[in-house]
Amino acid sequence: ILLKKPDAFLKELGDCYLMERDYEQMMPLFVRTLELNPGSIDNITVQLSFARSNDIVNSIDPVIEKTLKSLCQKTDYLPVFDELAVWYNLQIRNYLLALQHAVLLNNKSENKLHIFLNIALDAINNKAFDQATIAYQKILGKGKENNPFYLPARKGILTCRYEQLRQSPADRSDYLQIAGDCEKYMQEFGYTPTNIDILSLLAELYAYRLQRPDSADRLLDKAIRMPRLNSNTLSQLKSQRADLLTFMDNPWEATILYTQLEKANPNNDIGYEAKLKKAMLAYYAGDLLWAKAQFDVLKGATSKLISNDAIQMSHFIHMNYEAEGDNRDLEKMGRTEYLLYKQQFQEVLPRLDSLIGHCSPGISDYATLQKARSLCACFQDEEAAKLLSELKDRSEQVYIKAEALFQLAGLKRK
């Protein structure tokens, strides 16, 4: 009143109602803020995200939905409200409605194609692959000219198709088709540092889906020799090639690459991961004490995932190693895990059954965990869940019970 500006401090008043959780009063103020300043959309969505994360009784979503419905029923509502609708529908994973509003937004405004890219990435993260594909196709439909999102969409749709196939058993012909499309992409846009992600995807297809590991190795070697690669990309390619060499039963060259990665990345997760993988190679080969020493060093790694894996492996070896006794079962477990790494499931499962049936509880329970992993890799989730459920009830080892529960939770999230 004093300023004679009734629309002054709308956003600030809305923030006050937000803190009081009075969402019915908050939303009209945020809407008016967007009408006066559409550029404040990011600020408003940040505040709404905060409100949703602290809304323990789920009272804000009905208010947002009612507000959006009322706004979008008007004939000439502002494009910013389509943008708000896209944001909200991404939060609740309603990708089809998000796509509808993205189309409306792009019909009204220029330079909004990135909205489709955001939808696609979010959809892939939540395994909504069909909706992600539609979003990418909307970008590709605009053509190459004056379209900065054309190449990201071409790449994204290839990655999306591959991730979709990985979720269930797929025919070799499906992987061949994606590999062919990746090859066409590389021929069209070149073997350059900007296309390393597609080259890496093609190498993965060759190695693990099409039984052409030699082709994958040549491709990765070519990529590593590419000029003007940044150090992080080079490290990722070397790590991928070292993993492939391990898969190809060439642990010596893999160890050399992992050692190079360690030295080039002494204090980051790339180096720690290389050290972990090198320790796993020693474990596979039966060099148990050296492997355990490396796992012990990695217990303090900055990455929680690497640290947890190192702790688990160190504990497993410590609890089952006989300083003056026979460690053949432990060594056999290591060799069996190497077969599992190489995806030789027909050979792995009988070996695991033998270990489960004849070894001490420490090795038997651990072998059961690995059998569950093998079954999941073969898309036998129900059998894996049954095995894990029985294991968590019968095992007397705390870390085994915890890992069984963790894997069960992962299966339920599927």
Task: Spell out what each predicted region is.
Residues 1-414:
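Acidic, polar-rich low-complexity tracts and alpha-helical solenoid repeat scaffolds
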